[in-house]
Swiss-Prot record:
Keywords in alphabetical order: Amino-acid biosynthesis, Aromatic amino acid biosynthesis, Lyase, Pyridoxal phosphate, Tryptophan biosynthesis
Protein name: Tryptophan synthase beta chain
Class of the enzyme per the UniProt entry, highest EC level: lyase
Highest taxon, organism lineage: Bacteria
InterPro entries: Trp_synth_b_CS, Trp_synth_beta, Trp_synth_beta/beta-like, TrpB-like_PALP, TrpB-like_PALP_sf
Length: 399
């Protein structure tokens, strides 16, 4: 569907560039560089080498046989992005954007982060490339993801707790955009999700598409046919757009994004943007956002720090509006139960974000035939979430 995007960075009615004039020139410079280097054979060779020999690609497509048997119905295959270096899909995009920044002569990387995985990936590649790194993270998220805060600091990054607004991911993005506006001459903003002004959604789509390019070939090699469904969690939407990208033109493949319903889609404590959101402009893009009656961005909630974003990337808004993909809400209880299930049945402790996708697979698989297949992306590993899940279950873990 990327070919349907206009030069202005539009996905149907969504996307675009809604930024201060001070950033417009830098965005245009970034777009020109991206369009040049995406066609540059040497750049692609360098990126592929880093993905394969540093980030540990290709990631496995693993047949979850015991889970498939227990649920009955479809055969379930996990795309194991949790096995990448740094433990999540985030490094795919960071390598691409940071390599581009290096080619542009930038000396410093900045990023926002929610669960901390994008911050860790950015700090990791900044260390690899010998660049400065500053990461902005909501104060609430620094508290619930303290391990990742220390990992970023260990990697040489400065972590800036954001104490404005709700002190979560949207506020971290605000702070990062403000910092980029202040200092864009030597600084590259590494956008972590498929959000923001053009060309960020297009760049994230391209650099994360390696997930589905690999998965498509792997499922053909293992089963001889395309999957019947691809399932991935959605906050801003980077791992989901990467999981969907190579299947967009395969109309027989159902694409399903799983949003964080929090305490319930119909409650105020939710982050189910596509189901509950309205069209608006925020963070430099036109997309769907959770808003209050006055049209202001509403507070959101999820047990997952990586999914509690009040909007969604413009390509996801377009895919939902066009009917090419469907989006469902998964509440905290369902996600935690799925987190525990695959740990016990498959020996995999996945990120709580990914567990939202697993929870929907639990519902979907039994409705399908045994000769049908589902690919479910495990976007990250769950080390960072174990303490929070224990607390959720009332279990005390001693220091």
């Amino acid at each position: 569907m990327i070919k349907n995007q206009s030069q202005a960075g539009r996905y149907g009615d969504f996307g675009g560039q809604y930024v201060p004039e001070t950033l417009m020139t830098e965005l245009q410079r970034l777009d020109r560089a991206f369009q040049h280097y995406r066609q540059d054979a040497h750049f692609q060779e360098e990126l592929t080498d880093l993905l394969n020999n540093y980030a540990n690609r290709p990631s496995l497509l693993y047949h979850a046989q015991r889970l498939s048997d227990q649920l009955g119905g479809a055969q379930i295959y996990f795309k194991r992005e949790d096995l990448n270096h740094t433990g999540a899909h985030k490094i795919n995009n960071v390598l691409g954007q940071a390599l581009l920044a290096k080619k542009m002569g930038k000396k410093r990387l900045i990023a926002e982060t929610g669960a901390g995985q994008h911050g860790v990936a950015t700090a990791t590649i900044a260390a690899l490339f010998g660049m400065e790194c500053d990461v902005f993270m909501g104060k609430k998220d620094t508290n619930r993801q303290a391990l990742n805060v220390y990992r970023m600091q260990l990697l040489g990054a400065k972590v800036h707790p954001v104490t404005t607004g709700s002190m979560v991911l949207k506020d971290a993005i605000n702070a990062a955009l403000q910092e980029w506006t202040r200092r864009c001459d030597d600084t590259a903003y590494i956008m972590g999700s498929a959000t923001g002004p053009h060309p960020f959604p297009m760049m994230v789509h391209e650099f994360q598409s390696v997930i589905s390019v690999e998965a498509r070939q792997q499922i053909l090699d293992q089963t001889g046919h395309l999957p019947d469904a691809v399932v991935a969690c959605v906050g801003g939407g980077s791992n989901a757009i990467g999981s969907f990208a190579a299947f967009l033109d395969d109309t027989s493949v159902e694409l399903i994004g799983c949003e964080a319903a929090g305490k319930g889609v119909q409650t105020p404590l939710t982050a189910a943007t596509i189901e509950r959101g309205r069209t608006g402009i925020f963070h430099g893009m036109k997309s769907l956002f959770l808003q209050d009656k006055a049209g202001q961005i509403a507070p959101v909630y999820s047990i997952s720090a990586g999914l509690d974003y009040p909007g969604v990337g413009p390509e996801h808004a377009y895919l939902a509006a066009s009917g090419r993909a469907q989006y469902v809400g998964i509440n905290d209880d369902q996600a935690v139960q799925a987190f525990e299930l695959i740990a016990k049945v498959e020996g995999v402790i996945c990120a709580i974000e990914s567990a939202h996708a697993v929870a929907y697979v639990q519902q979907l698989a039994p409705t399908m035939r045994r000769d049908q297949t589902i690919i479910c992306t495990l976007s990250g590993r769950g080390d960072k979430d174990v303490a929070a899940i224990a607390k959720y279950r009332g279990v005390t873990i001693d220091d």
